[in-house]
């Protein structure tokens, strides 16, 4: 039997699983890591903790399953969305990652909306709002409040994309994470160059965007040693946790999901 590997880079920990082609769960391992709140409303993590947890959990999952590495045929990702991992010219992490639940960027989000000509203008660029959790506000915050770190930043990634980069050596994201920056034109499925230009960001720092089912690369020799996965294993882009969970629930076509609201509580 062949197996697929999955990695979810969560907020409280990373989970690594192996699933058989018949759908049975062959192994599951979780490793927790800390969250830091240096100021009220701030939420940060050390990306090195994600990687250490991923390597340990995946190696343990392979051992737990008893599966031969050669029978593992693919790997994909989900993970916490919107976090900012800033990388320098050597792809080293510049500062702790700013997470999805960080609330420091309220002023920056309003500034982005104003720069776009108001909410209607922003929707014309991206078909999306700009919320404090989104990555776009974090980029502007870094530019305004940590200009030295911003100047050092040559690339940025979101959390799961950073771990996939360490697995494959390729810097990329998927459409769901790109949308979660608030700077991505959802209809055109590309970053909005006009909006990014208005904000004074350099397009060169933005990652390549893939569809969730696109091949993102292959497990490198070094990553194989650290994780127990086979070298050369195909790695697919995956998506943000809030998106991938819908796929897991079978919400893959129009009419399978809706919403309701409570107008009055008795």
Which residues make up each language-model segment?
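Residue-level detector of conserved catalytic or cofactor/ligand-binding positions
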Residues: 257-266
